[in-house]
Design a protein with these regions (language model features):
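NAD-dependent ADP-ribosyltransferases
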Residues: 2-318
């Protein structure tokens, strides 16, 4: 375990070259006395497998201007990584729920399939799944395939990028699993980090053009508990009768190694994939770094004067 501060000044504990599941993380971090991680009275919650095909990049006004000016993404603060997160869609939740039910109850009848009510979205309440942003008022959402293709052409001379298990980072209430994407030309530089494999027991893997994410803690605030009725081959979300429990939540970050390059996209694609986000609470960016919707509309019109399409708002999963 190593300690440090991230670029925003927050204390962090991290384990390089590993994606530690919560059981292992609790053991590794037992001396830290993290009151959220070490909680034991957490209601039962589902462990789905999400097949994610989109990435998101949140930013504030200053970042948006830079992205438009350069028509792409570069690392701030003289760094070498451009950071994205997995962007889970409503279809991803629906598919994950179906897989979870099929795996748990493989012998369901057609009648039981039809009786089953949707439940998984009630557990998808952590910031990982939110339409709100902790980082700024602007969110770019791109197909994963498009990002990787642009990275391949611009940073890898057309070759396939390499993916590695970069690290696990623990904050007070947040666990971040980081995947590193780099050029084959930098194999030696990152050889100390294991390759990201298609391991069905891992927190995250990559297969067939998508990230397969198995969230360790998808709720943050536990308002529901998973109710399993094996005699009926059914699952449901039951309301928690006692006070709601707060727990750690996890997410997956994808760090693209670009050096001092700009990962470029067509300006029209940037505009099409841009949406406005309301501020999450608590936020990471400063309060004055967020903008209201009218301010955002004006800025986007200024930066894309030839595009008259209205600025859309990020929408909730539910």
């Amino acid at each position: 375990m190593k300690t440090g501060k991230n670029s925003r000044g927050y204390d962090e504990y991290y384990w390089e070259g590993q994606h530690l599941k919560l059981t292992d993380l609790k053991e590794e971090a037992k001396d830290l006395e993290n009151q959220y991680l070490l909680k034991e009275n957490i209601p039962l919650y589902p462990r789905p497998e999400l097949h994610v095909t989109h990435l998101k990049h949140d930013t504030k006004q200053y970042g948006l201007r830079g992205i438009r000016w350069k028509n792409g993404f570069k690392s701030p603060h003289k760094g070498s990584l451009v950071w994205w997160s997995l962007a889970v869609t409503p279809d991803d939740i629906t598919s994950a729920e179906r897989r979870l039910l099929e795996t748990t109850y493989p012998d369901r009848t057609q009648e039981q399939v039809q009786m089953q009510q949707s439940f998984l979205k009630k557990f998808a309440t952590s910031p990982s799944f939110s339409e709100l942003s902790r980082l700024g008022s602007y969110r770019f959402t791109f197909p994963l395939e498009e990002v990787l293709e642009a990275y391949s052409q611009q940073c890898c001379s057309g070759y396939q990028p390499v993916m590695r298990v970069y690290k696990t980072v623990l904050y007070q209430k947040e666990v971040m699993y980081v995947i590193l994407v780099h050029s084959p030309a930098n194999q030696e530089q990152f050889s100390d980090r294991p390759l990201l494999t298609d391991d069905p027991n891992s927190v995250c893997s990559y297969k067939d053009g998508r990230f397969i994410w198995r969230p360790e803690a998808m709720c943050e605030t536990h308002s529901y508990e998973l109710v399993q009725r094996p005699d009926e081959n059914q699952m449901e979300a039951g309301m928690v009768s006692s006070r709601h429990e707060y727990y750690v939540w996890d997410h997956v970050a994808v760090a693209l190694h670009v050096g001092r390059q700009v990962l470029k996209f067509d300006p029209a694609r940037l505009r099409r994939n841009l949406k406005y986000c309301e501020k999450a609470k608590p936020a990471i960016a400063k309060p004055w770094e967020f903008q209201d919707f009218q301010q955002a509309e004006e800025l986007v019109r200024e930066l894309w004067p030839d595009d008259s399409s209205p600025l859309e708002r990020a929408e909730p999963l539910n």
